[in-house]
Amino acid sequence: MVRVANSITELIGNTPIVKLNRLADENSADVYLKLEYMNPGSSVKDRIGLAMIEAAEKEGKLKAGNTIIEPTSGNTGIGLAMVAAAKGLKAILVMPDTMSMERRNLLRAYGAELVLTPGAEGMKGAIKKAEELAEKHGYFVPQQFNNPSNPEIHRQTTGKEIVEQFGDDQLDAFVAGIGTGGTITGAGEVLKEAYPSIKIYAVEPSDSPVLSGGKPGPHKIQGIGAGFVPDILNTEVYDEIFPVKNEEAFEYARRAAREEGILGGISSGAAIYAALQVAKKLGKGKKVLAIIPSNGERYLSTPLYQFD
C-alpha cells in the first residue's frame, strides 16, 4: 500500500522479506532475508531509535530542545539522529574511532555532534565517555544495551511483521546477529510463541565469542559482538550460538551483492553465511529467515567493498 506519512518516523518498520535464489543450494532449506535496510535511516536501528525516544517523551524525560547522548557503533546513532532531527531534539553520539567514515558523516548530516573514543577500548570506552558527559551536562542517555524499549519494539513490530509475512507457513529457523540483543530477544520471543518448533540462532564474531563463554577480542564485523553480554539479551531465547569469522562475513556480504543483488553490510554477511549453513543442516522443504540489519553503502570506505 502506498503511504503518505506525516513524519519520517511513521515510515519506520514494515520491512519486506526476500528469498535467496542463487546462493542457497537445491538440497538446502529455503533462505529468506528480512531487509531492515529498507527503513528510512537504512538500518534495523531506526526501530529502537524511535522507540527509546518516544518512551522517554511519554515518561517526561525528554522534550523539544533537549539533548540525547548515546554510545553507539553507528547505526543506532543514525536512527537516533534521524528521529531527533524530526522531533527537534539535539543528538550527541559517542563511538569508537574504528567506525566507518560514512557512519560519521551521516551522523553529521543529520545534525548530530560526534565524540570519538579509542578503538582499542571498544564499546566499553564509548559507554564510559557517554556516561561521563551525561552526568556532567544532564543529557538524556537512551542506553540501548539495557533499555527495555529496545526488545519491546521488536516484540511489537519486527516479530509481529514476520508472523504476518509468513502467515500459516511454518518458519523453521531464525538467524540474527547479536549487537544489543534487542532483535533476537524481542522478535525471537514472538516467533517462539507463533512457531513452537522454530530454532533460533545467535550470530557472534569468532574473534569475540563472549556468548559462547570465550574472551572478548577485536574483530571486523561492525555492529555485532560488543565484547560483553548485554543486559537486555534474553539468553534463553536462542537455541544455538553461531560463531562467524571476519572472512566469512565479508565473503558472503560480497556474494549476496554480486549474486543476488542484495547489498548488505558486514553483519548482514555474517547473518547470510550462518543462515546458509543452517539451511544445509535443515535440508529441503524447510524455511530459514535471517535479519539483514544494514545497507552496504554504509561500508564503501571499509575493506568490505574496496576495488583495485
Curated annotation (Swiss-Prot):
Disulfide bonds: none annotated. One of its GO terms (cellular component) is protein-DNA complex. It catalyses: O-acetyl-L-serine + hydrogen sulfide = L-cysteine + acetate. Its cofactor is pyridoxal 5'-phosphate. One of its GO terms (molecular function) is L-cysteine desulfhydrase activity. It comes from the Bacteria. Keywords: Amino-acid biosynthesis, Cysteine biosynthesis, Pyridoxal phosphate, Transferase. InterPro entries: Cys_synth, Cys_Synth/Cystath_Beta-Synth, CysK, P-phosphate_BS, TrpB-like_PALP, TrpB-like_PALP_sf. Pathway: Amino-acid biosynthesis; L-cysteine biosynthesis; L-cysteine from L-serine: step 2/2. NCBIfam families: cysK, cysKM. Belongs to the cysteine synthase/cystathionine beta-synthase family. Catalyzes the conversion of O-acetylserine to cysteine. Also acts as a sensor of cysteine availability in the signal transduction pathway modulating CymR activity. When cysteine is present, the pool of O-acetylserine (OAS) is low, which leads to the formation of a CymR-CysK complex and transcriptional repression of the CymR regulon occurs. In the absence of cysteine, the OAS pool is high and the CymR-CysK complex is mostly dissociated, leading to a faster dissociation of CymR from its DNA targets and the lifting of CymR-dependent repression. This is Cysteine synthase. The gene is cysK.
